[in-house]
Amino acid sequence: MSKVSKTAMPAGAGRGAAKKELPEHFKSYKHVWVFVELERGQVHPVSWELMGTGRGLADRLKVNLAAVVVGPEGQHTRNAALEAFCYGADLAYLVSDNVLSDYRNESYTKALTELVNTYKPEILLLGATTLGRDLAGSVATNLSTGLTADCTTLDVDADGSLAATRPTFGGSLLCTIYTLNYRPQMATVRPRVMPMPARVMRDAARIVVHPLGLVEDDIVTKVLSFLPDRDAETSTLAYADVVVAGGLGLGSPENFRLVRELAALLGAEYGCSRPLVQKGWVTSDRQIGQTGKTIRPKLYIAAGISGAIQHRVGVEGADLIVAVNTDKNAPIFDFAHLAIVSDAMQLLPALTAAFRARLLPDSRARIAV
């Protein structure tokens, strides 16, 4: 169904004779769709990030960009469809029904599958969130098409095929994957992998309302109660402007307090590399990298982190990366903007003291006394 290039290559490279003529019944599939994730009345930011990426793909293909909004009847759902036009949508598809009040795989899969079969997009993008991953897999299965998960780059090749690049083999390789002979071409992207596009006020264009035709008795799964994710309420790591993170170079779990102290002083979020989660030093909601969170802060300070590719793919969107490591050959220095060869155990307290003196001059006076 999907073809994988063995190494990261330019879009379209390495396919050769493997590409077959697209079956006739798929040639009518046109346009780029982005699924707008709406939960508890709020649009997940990854949806707007994907709208920016989708806009670029649609422009290169010379087709329309459409937003797909699925949710309960009411103003929140319609507002999400209207807001999509401010992020580049040419039209929006709206499925609004009270059986969609809570996310359930059965009802949402039916809604999105029906939309695809009726209006036939060539590309369908979803956020790689808990909801998006669950929905994308079931929709791709229903449609018997390919799905590339957790992409880091999306492009179109000279033939107009979607070239979806993602890490593989534990992050040691980047593979470009094509869904050659099936439609739609589906991909998911994690939050913060793509930049947030500028919001531009635009008049609403066309909204296509599609009836669901599903009643509550048709759905096996019932939602009895909703418990908010504790981590989602207490951590804003993925969308923080400043992030301080630590790795194994800190030496012990007790020393991780140096990361927390600097982050607290800067009003920043703190994170860590995967080994610290594996050792139980830090909870998994603070992990940064391929299997954790992707971040795009204005400033990222990495202390005692080697910078393997699994970590790199989660941080390389940062505006400024400051890396601290005792090993001058550490991989993180290959992509850091500022490399400091030093012991994090000595540098972090010095940085904290310097920032405290600069940001809190009263504390400097008290120390002098």
UniProtKB/Swiss-Prot annotation:
Q: Tell me the GO BP annotations in alphabetical order.
A: fatty acid beta-oxidation using acyl-CoA dehydrogenase; nitrogen fixation
- Key words of the record: Electron transport, FAD, Flavoprotein, Nitrogen fixation, Transport
* PROSITE patterns, per the entry: ETF_ALPHA (PS00696)
One Pfam annotation, family name? ETF_alpha
- List the GO molecular function terms: electron transfer activity; flavin adenine dinucleotide binding
Which domain of life, per UniProt? Answer: Bacteria
Query: Does the keyword field hold tRNA processing?
Result: no
Which sites bind FAD? 299-327
Q: Does the keyword Cell inner membrane apply?
A: no
Stated family: Belongs to the ETF alpha-subunit/FixB family.
State whether it acts alone or in a complex, and with which partners, per the record.
Answer: FixA and FixB form a heterodimer.
Q: What does this protein do?
A: May play a role in a redox process involved in nitrogen fixation.
What protein name is recorded for this chain? Answer: Protein FixB
> Which source organism?
Bradyrhizobium diazoefficiens (strain JCM 10833 / BCRC 13528 / IAM 13628 / NBRC 14792 / USDA 110)
Lineage, opening ranks: Bacteria, Pseudomonadati, Pseudomonadota, Alphaproteobacteria, Hyphomicrobiales
Q: Which gene encodes it?
A: fixB
